[in-house]
Design a protein with these regions (language model features):
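Primary recognition of N-terminal secretory signal peptides and signal-anchoring hydrophobic helices
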Residues: 1-3, 179-236
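N-terminal capping segments
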Residues: 1-119, 164-166, 177-178, 185-192
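Short beta-strand-to-coil "C-cap" segments at the C-terminal boundary of structured domains/repeats
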Residues: 42-46, 170-176, 231-236
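Helix N-cap / beta->alpha transition motif
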Residues: 97, 126, 210-213
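Short linear loop/turn motifs
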Residues: 116-132, 225-232
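Short, structured beta-strand/loop micro-motifs enriched in basic residues and often containing a Trp
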Residues: 134-149
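Loop/turn positions that initiate beta-strands
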Residues: 152-159
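Hydrophobic beta-strand signal
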Residues: 160-162, 169
């Protein structure tokens, strides 16, 4: 069974010249992941923001005042801004589209640099803009490995899938999601002005560095007593 997603799909009769609000009940909708020519996954670096974005997506889909129309895609932006980016509180019929909805969700989660981007562009992001400009905010990783694009097993709640013409938000972890929440990468720490290479582990938004890497950086011996690490100065 594929994982749940949220998306803005299509207006009552198409993509342009639509009536404000979710006329069909399916203009914004919940569905399940499906194979497509996904070009990237935008993953929040902060898991707390990923959760807020997913909640915003759920609120947006449930709010029948938000419909789909590419011509008036920014009316939902103005309405969301007026209510502090709480999509559940939009009370007048407005319009969005797939990428404009994702932008609302990200801003609702606290990615305020996207507000600056909107002001510069005078428009919500397209899918092209999402892939190129969102990572530059420093808030997202752009994942392009096949395991993220060809199946849903490694996706996390709050991930944003992007193709050339559509984008959706993941609302459930894939079956290997727990593995994804622990990321090991090469990093560095600075000791007395000198850079030392270490392995950094990111888990649930917290950074960890291996005791042995810290000991090596400080020129200490490391041993253990049971499950307790023991650091001692090396004999000169």
């Amino acid at each position: 069974m594929s994982i749940k997603i949220g998306q803005a799909s299509l207006g009552e009769t198409g993509g342009h010249g639509q009536q404000p609000g979710n006329q069909t009940g399916r203009e914004l909708n919940f569905s399940t992941w499906y194979p497509a020519v996904w070009l990237g996954v935008l993953r929040f670096k902060d898991p707390a923001k990923a959760e807020l974005a997913a909640k915003a997506c759920e609120d947006g889909v449930k709010n029948k005042n938000i419909g789909y129309d590419m011509d008036n895609r920014n009316t939902a932006y103005a309405a969301a801004k007026a209510v502090g980016w709480d999509l559940s509180k939009i009370t007048k019929p407005v319009e969005t589209d797939c990428s404009a909805l994702m932008m609302l969700c990200a801003i609702s989660a606290g990615v305020h640099k996207l507000e600056d981007l909107f002001r510069r562009q005078g428009n919500s992001c397209t899918t092209y803009c999402m892939r190129h400009d969102w990572p530059q905010t420093g808030e997202f990783e752009l994942l392009t490995a096949a395991k993220y694009l060809k199946k849903d097993e490694y996706l996390l709640r709050g991930d944003v899938l992007v193709s050339s013409g559509h984008t959706v938000m993941v609302l459930e972890d894939g079956k290997h999601g727990e593995e994804e929440r622990e990321v090991v990468e090469k990093s560095k720490i600075i000791v007395d002005g000198k850079e030392v290479s270490v392995e950094r582990i990111l888990k649930n938004g917290t950074n960890y560095v291996k005791v042995r890497d810290i000991a090596a950086a400080l020129d200490l011996e490391v041993s253990n007593k049971g499950n307790i690490a023991v650091l001692t100065h090396k004999e000169k």
